[in-house]
Each structure stands twice: as C-alpha cells, then as structure tokens.
Amino acid sequence: MAMATHFTFPFNYVVSEGSHGRRSFVRKLVRAVASGDSVAPAISEESKVKLGGSDLKVTKLGIGVWSWGDNSYWNDFQWDDRKLKAAKGAFDTSLDNGIDFFDTAEVYGSKFSLGAISSETLLGRFIRERKERYPGAEVSVATKFAALPWRFGRESVVTALKDSLSRLELSSVDLYQLHWPGLWGNEGYLDGLGDAVEQGLVKAVGVSNYSEKRLRDAYERLKKRGIPLASNQVNYSLIYRAPEQTGVKAACDELGVTLIAYSPIAQGALTGKYTPENPPSGPRGRIYTREFLTKLQPLLNRIKQIGENYSKTPTQIALNWLVAQGNVIPIPGAKNAEQAKEFAGAIGWSLTDNEVSELRSLASEIKPVVGFPVEYL
C-alpha cells in the first residue's frame, strides 16, 4: 500500500524559470517527498542580504527574542505557559512568513537578568522542534557575550560561547556579538571572537552598542587576522537616531559593517498602540511617558495616513523607514504569532523618498528618550 506523503509549499518562494533557487528547491522537494518528510516553507536567496563583509546571508529583517522567558523587564514580570506558547507561535510564524534570523543573548531571561527561563534555551528548543517537523529547516541564530567585569581574556569569550551553544542545542551559531564594551579588556574579547571563528564555533562576528571609535578599533583588530567585523547592533529607530548623530551609521556604511537595529519600533511606541491615556506598563512606562506620547502623536498620525496608502500598519511603516536607510537590518521583538506576521509584512515593498524624508523631518521635532550610555564611550 502506498504511503501518503504530506508536504507544504513555501509561503514566499519566488519561482523564476531556470533559476538556481528553483532548481535547488525542486531537488530538496524531491528528496523530501521520497523520504516521506514534510518540507519547510522555503526562504528565497533574493530575500536575504550579506551581513557585512562576511559570507553569512540573513533575511532583511530579523526577530529579537529578548522578551522570551524574561520576567525582569517584559511580560509584566511574569512568565507562564501561555506566554511560552505565544513565543513558540512567534517563532514558527516568522519562519512561515520568510524570516529566519533570530537574535538572542546569554543574559536574556537568564540568571543575569533574574528571568525564569533562558531565551537561548527556548530558542534552542523551538529550533529542535521545528527540525523534527521539517528536517531540512534552516534557522540563522545570533547570540551575544556579556562583557561582565569579572570576565577576563579571550578564553572567557570562547567559554561563554560554548555555554550558549549548549543552551541553544547547536554546534555553532551564525553570528556571535560582544553585547556591550567592557570596562576593560576589550582587546581580549575581540581576540576571543577571532578564536571562535577559527575554531568553527561561529560563521560571523559582530559587536553591539559600540561607538564610532570602538567600532573602528574592533574592525581593525579583527582585520589583522583576516576576519571581517560583520555587524554593530545598536538602538536605532525613527525617533532614536543617535547612530546618525554620533557617526556610527556613517562608519558602518564606510567600513561595510551591517547596522543591526534593536528597538526599531521604540519598544512599541511607534506601533500606535500607546497613547497619553494608555501608556505602556512596567519599566517602559517610565521611559515613554504621557508627556512624550503626547508629543509623539502628530508623527504617529502621519505614519497612519501613509500606512493607509499601502494598506500597512504604523509598525510596518516604521520598520520600512529603517530599511530605507540602507545597510540596516531591524530586529523587532516578537512575543506572538500576530506580531511576527506583522513584522514580516514590513519588507518586500518601499516607501517613497519623499515619505522617508517627511517622516524624518517630523521625527526631528521630537526629543529622543535616553539610550544606552555606552553608545557614547
């Protein structure tokens, strides 16, 4: 009796006659059907970009997973099974909609941040479960090293990475980043990144929250070993443009280092969800105050008007504005499937140059909130 085989065609696969991507997909499909496996929704190479000067290609938008398992800043200080299921939905929906780049860190939801469950552990579990369902599934993972004062030397970086790999249930990650510059010993940390590359533990390396000078120093130190600095992950959004004002964005563009933008929708402030009458809860409420949200309304109103022309949400407009800056990969944080699907709809189309300029002009009238202090060191 013939065995019935189930497979799912890719959600966003672009078929072009004679293309390498089409041939590759067909070969994978034939192998999967022959083996009885399900086929993961494919992500076309056209939807990916190279990360800096590395050989690593990732999707033009990623997903930040800081909130997964966290109870020190997000989730109203509580983590439960309902939020766990929602996070799993965010992961699967991201992949189903063409986003395969996930950014985590060893301090997210871990003992360092007093979280209940490690974000790395959850991401590793979700990847394992995805591959059990779709053996050929591919996921790009970025994680980070915490430059804690008691960590010294290059060995601390490799040791921390191996611990992260254990939590992620992986033998290597795609991108390993220094989460912030240390109080001392940064040369050793950079040497540790190089060692991790040479040991095959990571495909590409980057930094996070690095100023222009620190970025240039890191770039040159790694360059001496023939290793490209792939990325600098910083706080960057329509209403927080410090990377432009401090020279970080220009330096990234000059050196060919990809700028990965965290808080690209200003922790929800640019979604239109929050108003002076309904500010965010928890620590965010002390950052995005009623006074700030009042000043933000004219910009949000215009974002909504522009969004109506494209049938896009304010969130999608804000993210697309960042992509329009060039050499930028936004990584909004997704807590559930609905958010993940919305984020995926932020790419694959473009605002006009006039709209990009108009939004910048309106945003310039708003005094930005305080960022991460090390950005200016």
Swiss-Prot record:
UniProt keyword terms in alphabetical order: Acetylation, Chloroplast, NADP, Oxidoreductase, Plastid, Transit peptide
Classification via InterPro entries: AKR (IPR020471), Aldo-Keto_reductase (IPR050791), Aldo/ket_reductase_CS (IPR018170), NADP_OxRdtase_dom (IPR023210), NADP_OxRdtase_dom_sf (IPR036812)
Binding sites annotated in the UniProt record for NADP(+): S263, P264, I265, A266, Q267, G268, A269, L270, T271, G272, K273
GO MF term set: oxidoreductase activity
Any Pfam family matching the protein: Aldo_ket_red
Cross-referenced CDD domains: AKR_AtPLR-like
Modified residues (N-acetylalanine): A32
Protein name: Uncharacterized oxidoreductase At1g06690, chloroplastic
